[in-house]
Design a protein with these regions (language model features):
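HhH-family (HhH-GPD) DNA N-glycosylase catalytic core used in base-excision repair
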Residues: 1-192
């Protein structure tokens, strides 16, 4: 577990921002995220955030994903105080981060999102992943003191073009499909 103290980072605001469909609240101030082939659990109490993942994953993946190298207070301080609308937005959404997501994932999510709500988008992602994946077990951190392998299943199918991953606990994720982009687009439209 890595503990970081930071400003302008609110897990609840990020989860509700609609940027990704695989971040879920799983308890009081506890969240889980699947991005690409990575799984992360986080807790937050005020400005203290605990990342339950290997340090290597945090350094090489999650710092970039959550844009942690960027000081968002600089942006907020640049808002013209006479702009009441933007000032209010900066105050209300001060904990939102711009997630640095996989391009393929964003494109598919965007295609699915047209004329859909979040519940339906998650279901479509689940359907695509079930169609193109195979089961894979994922490791996750259960608490601060120990790391154990939980019965947390992902589906993954490898090909020269990439892989598709789906998690049975409603944490859908994938990197890239085995099918061509046009085949996936057609199947996505059919599943919507």
């Amino acid at each position: 577990m890595l503990t970081i103290e930071m400003d302008n980072f609110d897990l609840g605001q990020i989860c509700r921002s609609g940027q990704c469909f695989r971040m879920d609240q799983i308890g009081d101030d506890r969240y889980r995220v699947i991005a690409g082939d990575k799984y992360l659990e986080l807790t937050q109490e005020r400005g203290i955030v605990n990342f339950f993942c290997p340090e290597e994953d945090f350094i090489f993946f999650w710092i970039r994903y959550f844009d942690l190298d960027c000081d968002y207070s600089e942006y907020i301080n640049m808002i013209n105080p006479r702009d009441k609308y933007l000032t209010a937005a900066g105050e209300v959404g001060s904990g939102i981060r711009i997630l640095q997501q996989d391009l393929w994932e964003m494109i598919i999510s965007f295609l699915i999102s047209q004329q859909n709500n979040i519940t339906r988008i998650k279901k479509c992602i689940e359907n695509i992943s079930r169609e193109f994946g195979v089961r894979k077990q994922a490791a996750q951190v259960q608490n601060i003191m120990r790391f154990r392998l939980q019965r947390h299943w992902l589906w993954q199918r490898k090909s020269s073009f990439g892989s598709v991953i789906w998690d049975t606990e409603q944490n859908m994720c994938w990197t890239q499909p085995e099918k061509s982009v046009s085949e996936i687009f057609h199947l996505t439209v059919c599943m919507i």
